[in-house]
């Protein structure tokens, strides 16, 4: 009674080696939103720029434990003061999968599907978007009280049918 025992538990985590120190971020401390299960998102985050807050330091074993959730909450409080509706912003690409991509702006993680990334159908989003990139995105909706941020990369690009009359005039032929 009253003694502390070590507990062994398997846990997915992100390991960042920064300044010769291992920083471990458990999966439970990574996201404020719900992301697909299975660790696929964590695996595709290699090369991403992540913000985190150190919550524990073990100097004896030369590692630290951190929380990305706390950092995201702090960033959200700061960005909630600004009105960014209908603006074009620079969003960080955090993770890219075959059908979905995770962007971060101002502490908000936003899942984008293929229809919000490109006008044309792409079988694999990883061909056009890469982890670690900074992409222009248009803010479609921003409700800070409810924690809603909706982005679109597609709306920052010109529509493929704009100017089609000059490129392909009526009566022209292509051989």
Please give the residue ranges for each predicted region.
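Single-stranded RNA-binding regions, centering on S1/OB-family and related RNA-binding modules
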Residues: 1-175
């Amino acid at each position: 009674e009253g003694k502390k025992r070590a507990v062994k538990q398997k846990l997915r985590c992100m390991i960042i080696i920064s300044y010769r120190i291992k920083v471990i971020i458990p999966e439970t401390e990574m996201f404020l939103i719900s992301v697909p299960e299975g660790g696929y998102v964590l695996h595709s985050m290699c090369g991403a720029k992540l913000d985190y807050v150190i919550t524990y330091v073990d100097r004896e074993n030369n590692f630290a434990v951190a929380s990305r959730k706390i950092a995201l909450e702090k960033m959200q409080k700061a960005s909630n003061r600004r009105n960014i509706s209908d603006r074009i912003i620079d969003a960080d690409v955090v993770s890219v999968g075959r059908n979905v991509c995770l962007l971060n702006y101002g502490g908000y993680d936003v899942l984008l599907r293929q229809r919000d990334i490109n006008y044309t159908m792409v079988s694999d989003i990883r061909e056009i978007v890469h982890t670690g990139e900074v992409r222009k995105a248009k803010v479609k909706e921003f409700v800070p009280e409810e924690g809603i941020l909706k982005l679109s990369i597609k709306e920052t690009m010109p529509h493929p049918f704009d100017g089609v009359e000059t490129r392909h005039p009526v009566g022209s032929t292509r051989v």
